[in-house]
Regions:
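Helix-helix packing/entry segments at the starts of transmembrane helices
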Residues: 8, 14, 40, 96-102, ...
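Hydrophobic/aromatic residues within transmembrane alpha-helices
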Residues: 27, 37, 41, 87, ...
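Glycine-/small-residue-enriched transmembrane alpha-helix faces in small-molecule transporters
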Residues: 1-40, 75, 83, 146-173, ...
């Protein structure tokens, strides 16, 4: 049951992350820069988490070592978003999204090399299907498979994915972080990220004033659904099912963005995109069922090994 909840948290995290365009695009249309939007997003989300902590009477205090890890996590979280936005200036958004979503591969490699955790065959199959699905969905943003990219752009987006992969792995494998209250962890990661975004914005004209009441509402919703809800769900998922499985479930993020584009912004779904959606759904289904599938295969192999040689 705990793992089932973990899968639900993972899908909730990726689905709510996919709501980013719903609140970001209208705000950008009013003239706000991405630096300002991201800064307000993290600050407002931090305030919401702080209110929740006060309601639930969660202690705000952290030790020096814990704070060091939290600031580092905030840096990786900031780096993932900042590097991805930088990469958008050097290549098509579709290509950048596809390369960024290689991060499940990064998580799998880090877990295998540093923690000797080998992925199951079903996890590998799910990763391949999810990456293929994301690639097909991303073609919508690049006008097909065309598009060029500079070496710097490719490096930026790969570093973006690596930064997010390190964030996912760290949350689950550093004891001080893994045992920390989820609200406290989320608060200090978001606050640290806000600080880094604020520094970045100061080099690009500073943080803009919020232009209207509608923009304020969108920023608050941006802070709540694709930030507060998604990050709390993400942390719960990582602690329940691990970094690798959570990272693969992240493929639902572009799927949600597609649905929002169709329903809210009147975009159309092509045959290629439909195939991408199908591949992601199959990948997520495999991930959810993987514990049962792995257990079933292990049991069959055990029974086969116990059979007399003459009867095999």
């Amino acid at each position: 049951m705990n793992k089932f909840k973990g899968f639900l948290y993972g899908m909730t995290a990726s689905a709510t992350f996919g709501l980013l365009p719903l609140f970001t695009l209208p705000t950008m249309a009013e003239g706000m820069t991405t630096d300002s939007i991201l800064c307000y997003r993290m600050l407002f989300a931090s305030l919401l988490v702080a209110v929740l902590m006060m309601v639930r009477r969660v202690n705000f205090s952290v030790g020096v070592r814990e704070l060091s890890w939290l600031v580092l996590l905030g840096f990786f979280y900031y780096g993932s978003a900042a590097l991805l936005f930088q990469a958008y200036g050097s290549m098509s958004s579709g290509m950048a999204t596809t390369l960024h979503f290689l991060y499940p591969v990064g998580v799998t490699l880090i877990m295998a090399v540093l923690f000797k955790q080998r992925p199951s065959p079903f996890t590998i199959i799910a990763i391949i299907l999810a990456l293929s699905g994301v690639a097909l969905l991303s073609l919508r943003g690049s006008g097909g498979a065309e598009g060029s990219a500079s070496l710097v752009g490719i490096l930026l987006v790969l570093l973006s994915g690596l930064s997010y992969a390190i964030y996912l792995v760290t949350v689950n494998n550093v004891r001080r972080i893994r045992e920390m209250d989820n609200l406290k962890l989320t608060l200090y990661v978001l606050l640290s990220s806000a600080g880094f975004f604020l520094i970045n914005a100061s080099f690009n004209g500073g943080v803009q004033a919020i232009p209207s009441g509608a923009a304020l509402v969108n920023l608050l919703l941006l802070a709540f659904l694709p930030t507060l809800v998604s990050n709390l769900s993400l942390v719960r998922a990582i602690k329940s099912i691990g970094s690798t499985l959570t990272s693969v479930l992240g493929a639902m993020e572009p799927l949600t963005a597609i649905v929002i584009g169709v329903v809210v912004f009147g975009e159309t779904i092509s045959g290629t995109m439909a195939l991408g959606i199908l591949l992601i759904i199959v990948a997520v289904t495999i991930i959810v069922l993987s514990p049962l599938l792995d257990k079933n295969i292990a049991e069959r192999l055990r029974r086969f090994a116990q059979r007399p040689i003459g009867r095999r």
